[in-house]
């Protein structure tokens, strides 16, 4: 388990076919352990992004948050 004050563990972004995946796991000084992931795809005529995050353990533990968005250019 991650102890209070432990370093965050951002994983290197991974790219595959224009998709970029960025996972992250960290713990803050209040004892909250948060995991999150961001996904992006930037193309010639579009941008897409989505993310999911959750405080897994700690005083701010709650339901996950998420977002999805994008743009299309003609």
Swiss-Prot record:
Region entry Disordered, spans: 1-74
| InterPro entries, A to Z | Coleoptericin (IPR009382)
Please name the GO terms of the biological process aspect recorded for this protein, alphabetically.
defense response to bacterium; innate immune response
| Lineage: superkingdom | Eukaryota
One GO CC annotation: extracellular region
Sorted alphabetically, which keywords does the UniProt record give? Answer: Antibiotic, Antimicrobial, Immunity, Innate immunity, Secreted
**Cell location:** Secreted
Q: Which family does it belong to?
A: Belongs to the coleoptericin family.
- Biological function: Responsible for the anti Gram-negative activity of immune hemolymph of Z.atratus.
> What name does UniProt use for this protein?
Coleoptericin
